Structure formats: C-alpha cells, structure tokens
C-alpha cells in the first residue's frame, strides 16, 4: 500500500493525473471494454447511492414523485423541437436494426439486414421528447396540473474525450420534468429545484457553489433560461454541478400538449426540466481530496468510522473485540456507519493507508495499552490530526467530530474558492489572470460574438450571471472589457471541465 500511495501523483505535479490515479486507486471506478463507458465499482457506487438517497428525499419533500420512461426514443420525436435536436444531434447513438443472426461463415454474429427498423431509435441523451409525448395523454384540464415527475436513469451521449465521472458516454443521473398551468409556476419550479441542488451541494457535499443563470449561448438546447450551480475545483477550473431549465411552452407546442384552463380556454402547458449526474462524484473528489487520497464529507461517506485493533496475540484480540462490540453498537444507535476491521490478513499499517486513501472521515484505533487505559486513538481524515480519548462517551465525541469535519471541509473549500475570485476591467488583464485559474468577474456586452471571441482566444467561458454579489459594485452597469460597449453587470468567466 505504501508503494501504491507513493504512486499517487501529487496535485502540484499533475492535477489531471492525480485525479485519474485517485479514482482508480480508491476503487471508485475504472474504464470498461466499451470506449467512453465506465464501471462504477462498489465503493464508488456506495457514495452515489448516498447522494441519490438524499436527493430523492429532497425531491419528495418538494412534492415530486418518481417514474420511469423508455430508454429508446423514436427519431422523429427529436425532430419536433428544432433547437433541442440541434443541441444533441452529434452526440446521439442510433439503433437501426432489431435483430442479429449467425454469420454464414461461422465467424460469429452479424446484423441481420432484413431486420432494419422502419424508424430508427435514439438511445436517450435526455428524455424531454419521450416524456412530453407521454404527457400529452396525461393532461387535458388545469385539474391535471401540475405534474412533478423525476426519473433516475442512465443516458448516453457520444463523447470523444472522456474522463471517469466527469465526462463519459454513458452516465447515471436524475432528470426532473414538470408541467404547469402558468409561466409563473414553471419559473418558480425551475428556481426551487436550483435551490435544492445548491442546498444539497453545500450541506451534504460540502461544496460551495455559485447560483446563476447561463448566457443565451450556454443555455440548454430548447430552454428559455438555464439556471446553474457552478463549483470551483482545486486547480481553479469550474465544474457545472447541476442545471435547472425553464422550457417555456416549447415542448408543449412541439408535442401539442394543451389543457383547458379555468376560463375554459385551450392553452399550452408550461414546462421545466432539471438534472444532476455522476459528475457530482467528480466534484466531490476534486474539491476536497489531497495527496494522500480521498477526503469524503461525513454526510456522504459510505463508512463514516473505521475501527482498527492492534494486538499481540489472539487473547488480546478477543478482549479488544469485546470492548469494541459495545462501541460499535452505540455508534450505530446514533445512525453512524461504522466498520470494525479485525481481519488478520492485512497489517494495521496497510489498513491505515487504505482507509486514508478511501477518505474514511474518522479512524479509531485500540491497542493493548488502550485496552488497559480505557482509551482509543482518534484520527480525523480532513486534518490527519490524532488524539487519544477515553472510551466513556466516545460515541458522542465521534458524533460531534463528524459534524466538525463536515463543517471544516466546507469552510476550507469556501475559503479557497473565495480567495480565487478576481475582478478585472481590461481584456489584457483578463488574459493574464485566466492563466492563473479561478473565477473572474468581468463586464461583458451581452453579445454572442464577444463571448465566442473570448472563448476562442482564452478557452474561458461565461459560467453564469451570478445571483449573489461577490464584490462591491459587481451588479452595477459598466463597460465590456473587450468592446467597451455597455454592460448590465459583471459575469463569471472561468475555464471549465
């Protein structure tokens, strides 16, 4: 294990390689036989399950229900909404045949040319079209509204440059699709779900985010507005961590979804969609982890506490086992997930390094002297600090420590992010500062042409027009740093994943 840890590239040497090493060595995920598709390993999936469980609870608390819609979408459905199909056309995987057959030369199976589909099917890149075709059958009257549906699913988008969790051809996500009687209700829903995502990111992931609206050039294909939460990684790059879209009546018109309103008049339905994906795993890893491995927030750690015994003989181990049994029971009563690793096939030092690599928030160690003194050694993963504490009331001590760790890693990430937010007024200064990374607040004239020029010349994009103020005067009008034309307010630029 010492060698494996040594092989973990340091962030300062190659941040990208550090991330790749960590995902594999911490047993989170690995590449598969299919290019661009990943295998999420049990430990990585356990983290995703905790994310999924918490988000699902938050969705249900806001009145949403889960449903499931088909993986395969008729090609004609994508043609109904012009902007939408243009946004996804190059990424779509297409099913053209419904059957294979044995090759005549015995070399294996081949596509049966006689089994060509009358209409090709698209493996869902997102589900707006298939869902709105379904909603047409569900909605006739204002009494049928609102519909607040969420789907947990996989989606597929061909990606040329893939990275585990951050950008893969197939990924897991949730997608909410809601239908409303009024524009106001739909807009409120889009903001409500953005706030749910922000609360989840900050309270559970301990990842500080900026809430804002995307520029027209960056918004979701087919949306009137796209709201986003943007996080900053340790290399100063932005990661879009969740989006919520106000779709207006575009999809209702495309699929002729109308309802009779309270005035007994026909009207098109208003819509939203919103989603987060396994990209959140990448955000979690890159925001908190260090050169020793993962640093997981206790709220999402599959194992919050690990206990490791150090013993000289089997008799001593039995005494430690008996002592630890009660501690484990009391920790579990407090809802803390705990693992007692008394397996004899690995040395304590190996276990320490392994659990450190996997980001377990708290490690408890009991040896022979601890047994005599009724103490345990406690190590917290976020700071690597150690302390010897009494076993009396240790469950309460650990419970408080987990909350302290959760708060500390959020504070650390927030302090770092805030220190990397810069304000610039000239394009020359912008080009200099963007090389250093971080978020840059600058004036922009609101045109696609200027936005594209900045992107082409610096690889920086407008992450969002933020809702909150970061520096005095950033919400006041000014002059575009590139053209000198009027600008309504400063926007956030950054290079991104």
From Swiss-Prot:
Catalysed transformations (reactions): tRNA(Pro) + L-proline + ATP = L-prolyl-tRNA(Pro) + AMP + diphosphate
One CC-aspect GO term: cytoplasm
EC number annotated for this UniProt entry: 6.1.1.15
Record localization: Cytoplasm
Pfam families, per database record: HGTP_anticodon, ProRS-C_1, tRNA-synt_2b
One GO molecular-function entry: ATP binding
PROSITE patterns referenced in this protein's UniProt entry, alphabetically: AA_TRNA_LIGASE_II
Entry annotated with the keyword Nucleotide-binding: yes
SUPFAM superfamilies in the record: C-terminal domain of ProRS, Class II aaRS ABD-related, Class II aaRS and biotin synthetases
Bridged cysteine pairs (disulfide): none
Signal sequence range: none
Superkingdom of this protein's organism: Bacteria
Gene Ontology BP, a term: prolyl-tRNA aminoacylation
UniProt keyword terms in alphabetical order: Aminoacyl-tRNA synthetase, ATP-binding, Cytoplasm, Ligase, Nucleotide-binding, Protein biosynthesis
Main location: cytoplasm
CDD domains: ProRS_anticodon_zinc, ProRS_core_arch_euk
Record has Ligase as a keyword: yes
Family label: Belongs to the class-II aminoacyl-tRNA synthetase family. ProS type 3 subfamily.
Subunit structure as annotated in this protein's UniProt entry: Homodimer.
Known function: Catalyzes the attachment of proline to tRNA(Pro) in a two-step reaction: proline is first activated by ATP to form Pro-AMP and then transferred to the acceptor end of tRNA(Pro).
Entry text on domains: Consists of three domains: the N-terminal catalytic domain, the anticodon-binding domain and the C-terminal extension.
Name of the protein described by the UniProt record: Proline--tRNA ligase
Species of provenance: Bacteroides fragilis (strain ATCC 25285 / DSM 2151 / CCUG 4856 / JCM 11019 / LMG 10263 / NCTC 9343 / Onslow / VPI 2553 / EN-2)
Gene: proS
